[in-house]
């Protein structure tokens, strides 16, 4: 049974022309998140920024100095934010990246992004435990493929809209109270 259950849904009308930037969400008290951001900043973001000039918003509590003191052009470190500010970021950024290289289990940050209808680009580690995610998100592990995928989808309004619609439909089908009760019923039959 999933730990992520929603009673109400966002019904986001994704409007790419009103959105900008790439968002990462994850607490830095968890080592895989720090590794993910450092790897993204070192190996992926420079080429992404060179190609599409997209800002990179970093959200997460307990950000260490090496994150909070970043001066890289285009990088905006938000640190810890309120639920309201996080919701605003989900509703104003074009896509979420989850560049995890290690860690286990279903990633709440991926499910939450899908819930908000924001397109997701992740690694296979970020996709772990979310059946069928490759049909609604972009899953890549190789650095250059991640760069290419982010740049291509970021500039493709139709693809962004399609991914947003698919992610919201997926959350309704897999993470609604009804879906979870159906799983419980199946387990007891």
Segment roles from a protein language model:
Residues 3-85, 91-92:
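Conserved catalytic-core segment of nucleotide-activated headgroup transferases in glycan assembly
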Residues 29-32, 105, 138, 172:
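Glycosyltransferase donor-binding loop in the core domain
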Residues 34, 87, 107, 161:
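Glycine-rich phosphate-binding loop at the start of an alpha helix
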Residues 91-105, 118-119:
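Acidic donor-binding loop of glycosyltransferase active sites
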Residues 109-113, 119-122:
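Short hydrophobic beta-strand element within catalytic cores of glycosyltransferases
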Residues 124-139:
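Short acidic/histidine- and often glycine-rich active-site loop of Leloir-type glycosyltransferases
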Residues 136-144, 152-157:
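Conserved acidic donor-binding segment of nucleotide-sugar-dependent glycosyltransferases
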Residues 158-188:
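A charged, aromatic-enriched C-terminal amphipathic alpha-helix characteristic of glycosyltransferases
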């Amino acid at each position: 049974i999933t730990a992520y259950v929603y009673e109400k849904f966002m019904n986001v009308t994704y409007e790419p022309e009103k959105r900008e930037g790439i968002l990462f969400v994850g607490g830095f008290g968890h080592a895989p998140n720090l590794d993910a951001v450092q790897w993204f900043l070192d190996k992926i973001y420079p080429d992404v920024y060179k190609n599409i000039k997209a800002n990179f918003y970093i959200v997460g509590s307990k950000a260490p100095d090496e994150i909070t003191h970043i001066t890289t052009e285009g990088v905006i470190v938000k640190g810890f934010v309120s639920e309201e500010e996080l919701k605003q970021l989900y509703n104003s950024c074009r896509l979420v990246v989850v560049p995890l290289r290690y860690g286990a289990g279903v990633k709440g940050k991926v499910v939450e992004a899908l819930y908000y209808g924001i397109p997701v680009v992740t690694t296979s580690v970020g996709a772990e435990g979310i059946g069928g995610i490759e049909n609604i998100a972009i899953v890549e592990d190789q650095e250059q493929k991640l760069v290419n995928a982010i740049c291509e989808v970021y500039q493709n309004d139709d693809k962004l809209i399609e991914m947003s619609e698919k992610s919201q439909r997926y959350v309704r089908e897999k993470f609604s109270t009804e879906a979870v009760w159906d799983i419980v019923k199946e387990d007891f039959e």
